[in-house]
Structure formats: C-alpha cells, structure tokens
Amino acid sequence: MPCRILTLQSEAQWPLLGDMLAGRYDPDDAVEPVVRDILAAVRSKGDEALAEYTRRFDCPDFTPALLHVTSEEVAQAVASVPADDIAIIRQAADNIRSFHEAQKERSWFVTHDDGTILGQKVTPVDRAGLYVPGGKGGDTPLLSSLLMNAIPAQVAGVTSITVASPPRPDGTLNPHLLAAAHILGITDIIRAGSAWAVAAFAFGTQTIAPVDVIAGPGNIFVTTAKRMVQGRVAIDMIAGPSEILILADATARPDWVAADMLSQAEHDPLASSILVTTEPALAEAVTAELERQLATLPRADIARKALADWGAVVVVPDMDVAVAIANRVAPEHLEVLTAQPWELAGSLRHAGALFLGPYSPEPLGDYFAGPNHVLPTMGTARFSSALSVQTFCKRTSIIAASRAFAERNADAVARLARLEGLEAHARSAASRNSQQ
C-alpha cells in the first residue's frame, strides 16, 4: 500500500490527519548556522565568496570573472533551443502575462468638499532578484519559476531584474533557461546558487547591486537564507515542500486522481499528496492506481517515500466533512474532482490555488494556464496568498489637507496627541489653527 488510508467520521477527528502532517513543519536547526556563515562571507568578501562557494558545490574551475552571463552566451543558447520549445515558452509567458495584467493596482485619490485630497500611490520597487533552481546537475532548471516570478515583476513595473541560477559543472547555464530569460527581455543573469545567491541579492557585491525584493523557490538553504535576510529586503514567502489535496466524489477517475497525486509526490520526499473522498470504492481504486503508475515512474523512489511518509487517502461521510478537512489542511494546491465543483468553491476558504473540475490538473496551472504557481505551503494559505504583481509593489498614502480641514480638526488632533503624552505632536497640529 503506497500510503495510509484513514476514515474520518467528522471534523472532530481532524487530528488523525493533522498529527500526521505536523512533522513536516519541523525546522532543521542544523541549517541556520551554516547559512549564517554563508551570509557573512558574501557580505564581507562579495564576488570572491560567491566564486568560492560555486567552486565547492557546482563548478570546480569557477572564478569571479564567470559570474555574469554574457550576451554572446545568451545568443548561442537561444540558437540551440528547438523552435518548438521557444514557441511553447512564449505561449506560457503570454498566458502568465495576460493573467497578471488583470492584477495591476492603480493609484487612487479622493477629493473632499473642503479641497482635501487623500489617496494611495502604488509604486513598483526599484530592483528585484529572482532565484531559479538549476535542477539535477543544472540540466532541469525550473523554467516555469522564472516565468512565474519575472512576469509579475515586469507587469508591476520593476525596471531592474536580476536572475541567479547555479551553473552546471562546466560553468554554463542550461540553454532553455537562458532562452526563457531572453524571451522575457532579462539580460542581467548571474551564475550563483543556494544561500550565497540570496546573500548577493540582499547585500550586493562588487558587481551585483542589492535588490529590494527577493523571489523564487529553492531548497532549505535558499529558504533559510531568505528568512534570515527578510527585513533587510522583502521576500516573496517562506515556502515549504510541495503539496496537493484532492476532493473527489464518485465521478472522479481513479487513474486521473492517482496521476495528480503523483505529480506532487515526485517533487520531493517531503511532498504531501492527500485524497479526501466520500467514496470507499474510489479510495481503493486510487490506491491500486498509485501502485500501477509508480511501477513506470522515473522518480518512483522519491514519490514512494513522499506517499509513505506524508501521503494519505481519507474517506469521509459527506462533502461537508471533506470541505472542513480541506480548510484545516489549507493546501498549496486544492483540486476539486466532483460533479459540481463550483458548488464547493465558495466554501473552500483556505488554499493557495483551486483547480476546479476534471480538466484542471495541477500541472496545467503550474506551467501554462496563467495564474501564479508560487503558492503558500505548510498551512500558510490560511493567511497568505500566491506571488502576484503586488509582491513587487508598495503603497504610499497621500494626505494633502486643505486649510479648512487642518483648522477644523486641529483641536481634535491636539487632544488625541496629549492623551498619548506627545505634546510636540499636539503643538504641531494646533499651530495650523489660525483661531489660536
């Protein structure tokens, strides 16, 4: 049996599943001291520290001179990528851009009768640093993550975007990654990975300018580094391992449910794939399908461990309990494979993204549909949202008071200030009252 099967009669039995998942949230305390040393080294030594770490972990012959990718390298990479792949990347980028254009916020102003103008000014940050994992040996870079991070920044109006990705052992970056950057018009690309890339973004080096926002996925070293520099710079989120929860009734196809569960389980041994269903027969059929599909899956070892440790098939008496369990989990990806998925959508309050209906598999959203795939994990969808255009914007309040407004409210403001013991505040407000 690839994963445990649980039967929950009510939401009150949630701990049977919640306790199982709790272990995924435990931090690795051994990582933080290592990352702290990396941050300090890059802050002190800059490019040389980046080169030292890259020599140690990625490319044995790396030097500071290789940090920045040249335009000639990008041109060669683009020429080497099949035209069909270029077309697919362009289409995905167009879909993502179209969706995020709808997210754009605009500055707004309200004028009062006395002439006072109040408003909110929306401004993009100046610089963004985007991290793109290189994948296995640098040969499976997360192209989709580059698109999902860069396009919202561009739509927001960020004019300076730097991309960092670890090089392959020969010092090159994957041509498809460089082609994707070229399609997006990004020219500032550095060869650096892990926590030292995050450090370069946060502190800057001799040749890399510090940024205002750091975004992009990564392993525990990247995530820990982002957490430790947060406050000096903004970050997109603290993301954990991938996860999916599927709500399914008798109309769901077992082979599709199993395929969707495995789409997340193959990511990482810590990934979580959960089916919640009202149908015991579906639970049994999906379990059998998981075994059948695992037999031919290239990353079966990873998927098996993820399912064994963090996967579950949960049988519940009705969809009310199923929805309650889903809201408790607050998963990164929530698929609804039921006869009437839209009827449940309003009750599903906590999820990074909702995938409604049998033709909305999670990978469609991950790669191509348009909504962002950088999503809250580990239950944080209870209070946080997907990466968006807003990740790269800030909002500034505007107060342009008229003389009449200032004079009319001077005494009230002064009184509030004195209640807080702030006499200088009170005098500042009162000084605008010409009646005194």
From Swiss-Prot:
Keywords: Amino-acid biosynthesis, Histidine biosynthesis, Metal-binding, NAD, Oxidoreductase, Zinc
Pathway where it operates: Amino-acid biosynthesis; L-histidine biosynthesis; L-histidine from 5-phospho-alpha-D-ribose 1-diphosphate: step 9/9
GO MF term list: histidinol dehydrogenase activity; NAD binding; zinc ion binding
Residues binding substrate, per UniProt: 242, 264, 267, 333, 366, 420, 425
Gene Ontology CC terms: cytosol
Active-site residues, record numbering mapped to chain: 332-333
Keyword S-adenosyl-L-methionine assigned: no
Protein's UniProt keywords contain Amino-acid biosynthesis: yes
EC annotation from Swiss-Prot or TrEMBL: 1.1.1.23
Cofactor note: Binds 1 zinc ion per subunit.
Catalytic activities: L-histidinol + 2 NAD(+) + H2O = L-histidine + 2 NADH + 3 H(+)
EC main group: oxidoreductase
Residue ranges of the TM segments: none
InterPro entries associated with the record: Ald_DH/histidinol_DH, Histidinol_DH_CS, Histidinol_DH_monofunct, Hstdl_DH
Cofactor: Zn(2+)
Annotated residues for binding of Zn(2+): 264, 267, 366, 425
Pfam families: Histidinol_dh
Entries under CDD domains matching the protein: Histidinol_dh
Primary role: Catalyzes the sequential NAD-dependent oxidations of L-histidinol to L-histidinaldehyde and then to L-histidine.
HAMAP family: HisD
UniProt record similarity statement: Belongs to the histidinol dehydrogenase family.
Protein name: Histidinol dehydrogenase
